[in-house]
A protein has these predicted regions:
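N-terminal small-domain helix-loop-helix segment of the aminotransferase-like
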Residues: 7-99
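Short catalytic/ligand-binding loop motif for oxyanion handling, primarily in non-cytosolic enzymes
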Residues: 40-45, 165-168, 197-198, 224-227, ...
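Walker B catalytic acidic pair
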Residues: 193
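Conserved core segment of the aminotransferase class I/II
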Residues: 52, 75, 79, 214-283
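Conserved core of the PLP fold type I
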Residues: 59-182, 196-212, 216, 359
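PLP-dependent enzyme catalytic core of the Aspartate aminotransferase-like
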Residues: 70, 82, 171, 328-333, ...
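Conserved glycine-rich beta-strand-loop-beta hairpin in the small C-terminal domain of fold type I
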Residues: 33, 279-293, 300-321
Length: 366
């Protein structure tokens, strides 16, 4: 059978997860799966949220509209862009996607650019998707060092803040100035910040940057309200040509995103019951994350060359232990060589771990 080879490799994170599960099964011992990329402190309680959903309704049981259920897109605008007038035009700025990764892949597919700039420390899937879509890519060291005057409308810059894998958070003023500077130059900015609302839910940053042209926002709900199994995200963009092509690709790639998932997430972000549920979920999750990060600091496991005097924000942290060392101590982790394109040998002595687990369990292994 003749096939088209993507030249991308299978996800290391998935492979490590399989290795950890196999070891736990074979040894009968408990392993701490910090290789994962999901919140695992507590589950969000949907008991009161789903009470208002009619599982026998037509809306629940049939295909959703191509761009997403209209009331859900209205709720997204209300949650992320509260100063924006909700009308036919603004509703077309929001397209519902089955999670964050498909959103990013669609963006990479659609943009006709000569080069995509990723951060030095980056989620490995960025480059894998670019490879599959045959997009050239390179890297920048930090937001502050991006040389805007050397870029033009043939460049796309990905910004992940707080960063995955490091958890480094750039100040909002620096972010805002750089996004404005880049977009005014015609550079396309893809803002991928799925962990922000876990910690900063009531801020207006998304609302503020939404005024810029040449900006695309990709979002994954699972990083701040849980429910990764529902596969729910969205793309925000004001460019009509981009949205027209996105509408076509959404149709032929997905033919609508799960109606039940949209209805559940809509109620989580828009109803009193849902807001109470995700507020509790976020509070408990953040409390445990902060305790875990403090433990890493106390044990001097956070590399100063990455963090200096700062602490990571988000569900990930980098520590001064290798993937193999941690595995020998029954901890699943992902070597930092999977999150850089250069100097892989050097960074292989460090690992990214997920710190979004119960503190008692985390403390037991460290």
């Amino acid at each position: 059978m003749k096939i088209n080879i993507s030249n991308a490799t299978f996800s290391s994170i998935v492979g490590i997860g399989q290795k950890v599960k196999k070891a736990a099964k074979e040894t009968g011992q408990e392993y701490l799966e910090l290789n994962r990329g999901v919140n695992a402190v507590v589950e969000i309680d949907l008991t009161k949220v789903v009470d208002g959903i009619n599982f026998n309704s037509k809306e629940f049981q049939v295909y959703a509209p191509n761009l997403g259920i209209e009331s859900f897109r209205e709720s997204i605008i209300g949650e992320y862009f509260p100063s924006m007038k909700i009308d036919e035009e603004s509703l077309n700025f929001v397209s519902v996607t089955p999670g964050g990764m498909p959103a990013l892949d669609l963006v990479i597919q659609i943009l006709n650019v000569e080069n995509v700039l990723f951060p030095k420390f980056y989620w490995g899937s960025y480059s894998k998707m670019a490879t599959i879509r045959k997009r050239s890519f390179s890297f920048y060291d930090s937001i502050e060092t991006i040389e805007t005057d050397k870029l033009n409308d043939s460049t796309c810059v990905f910004i992940c803040d707080p960063n995955n894998p490091t958890g480094i958070k750039v100040s909002d003023s620096v972010l805002l100035n750089k996004i404005e500077e880049l977009t005014k130059k015609g550079v396309i900015v893809v803002f991928d910040s799925p962990y922000r609302k876990l910690f900063l839910n009531d801020d207006r940053f998304f609302d503020t940057i939404s005024k810029f042209d040449n900006l695309i926002i990709t979002e994954s709900f699972s990083k701040w309200i849980g429910l990764s199994g529902l596969r729910m995200g969205f793309i925000f963009c004001k460019n009509k040509d981009f949205n027209s092509e996105l509408n076509i690709r959404l149709l032929y790639e997905f033919n609508g995103v799960s109606s039940p998932s949209q209805m559940i997430v809509e109620r989580v972000i828009s109803t009193p019951e849902g807001k109470e549920a995700h507020t509790h979920f976020r509070r408990i999750t953040v409390e445990n994350i902060q305790k875990n990060i403090q433990l890493l600091k106390d044990y001097q496991l956070l590399p100063e060359e990455i963090y200096g005097k700062k602490l990571p924000i988000g569900i990930f942290a980098v520590i001064k232990k290798s993937e193999d060392f941690l595995f020998q101590n029954r901890i699943g982790a992902v070597g930092m060589d999977k999150f850089v394109y250069h100097d892989k040998d050097y960074w292989s002595s460090y690992s990214r771990i997920c710190v979004s687990v119960k503190h008692e369990l985390f403390n037991k292994f460290f």
